[in-house]
Amino acid sequence: EETMALRPAPQAKKVLIAGGGIAGIEAADALYKRGHHPILCEAGDTLGGQFVLAGAAPRKGDFQRAAYMAAENIRDLGVEIRTNTPVTPALIAAEKPDAVIIAIGSKPIIPNIPGADSGCVVESHKLLAQKDVSAGKAVVIGGGLVGMEVAEFLAGKGSSVTVVEMKDSVLGELGQLRKIGTHMAMAQEDIQVLVNTTCKEIRADEVIVEQDGKERMLAADLVVMAIGSKPVPSQDLQDTCAEAGIPCYVVGDALAAPRLALNAIHEAYRAALSI
């Protein structure tokens, strides 16, 4: 605890933070309180990142509220915030920061499935960000936590939902109690789950899957990809920092995805203490 305490920095430094998610916000908060000048840059128009998207899922409104409160807190402190501002090698060269923290998060994995680029296909992140969603029949590819939350989200909007999972069970990464709670909620919705099932092809109004060696067709007005996430590439930013001799820290989902929120926050805090 002693080594993790916030102490005034011996010298104030300009720190460029790439990404306004929960990790970037935590880094900005800790840096400012230590006496540094953090510049928090977010490529989108709002702060909060994955926490805001997660808050759109059923029973997760607290996530969204926590993200908004954290963002409001650093605004009240006086942290310099730049939305609609992605951090690029050119920006790093122009700002000449003393350090850079990369917290640009993750993006959904899009599998190499014929038809995955069709107009009826949407990433889970983008779906949860939409205000108005309507789909008569929806197929969700992936039965992890995000996939099941998306399924419940769509069912709550009146859609008939089928989840396609290649493993022998869904929600594999969850503890037993959370699995039970999620299954109970799903039982009240129009959600069909197909395990040991592989998506073979996506067409304009149907999805071809294979289960037990047999192909079948699933009617689909909407197909949602929810098979996992991977870090948003940041090697160009890291290389720019290395060439300029600027200390660079990669935290949260930008380092490895997916991460627990507490891990991302802890990494951001530790990075802020290291500067």
Where are these regions (language model features)?
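N-terminal Rossmann-like dinucleotide/flavin-binding domain of flavoprotein oxidoreductases
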Residues: 49-97, 172-198, 205
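Ferredoxin-type iron-sulfur electron-transfer modules in oxidoreductases and energy-metabolism complexes
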Residues: 1-9
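Rossmann-like dinucleotide/flavin-binding elements
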Residues: 8-47, 82-96, 103-120, 124-176, ...
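Short, solvent-exposed coil/turn segments at beta-strand boundaries
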Residues: 202-205, 222
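Short, conserved beta-strand edge motifs with alternating hydrophobic and charged residues
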Residues: 102-103, 194
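Generic beta-strand structural signal
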Residues: 201-202, 250
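Residues that recognize and position ribonucleotide moieties
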Residues: 192, 200, 216-218
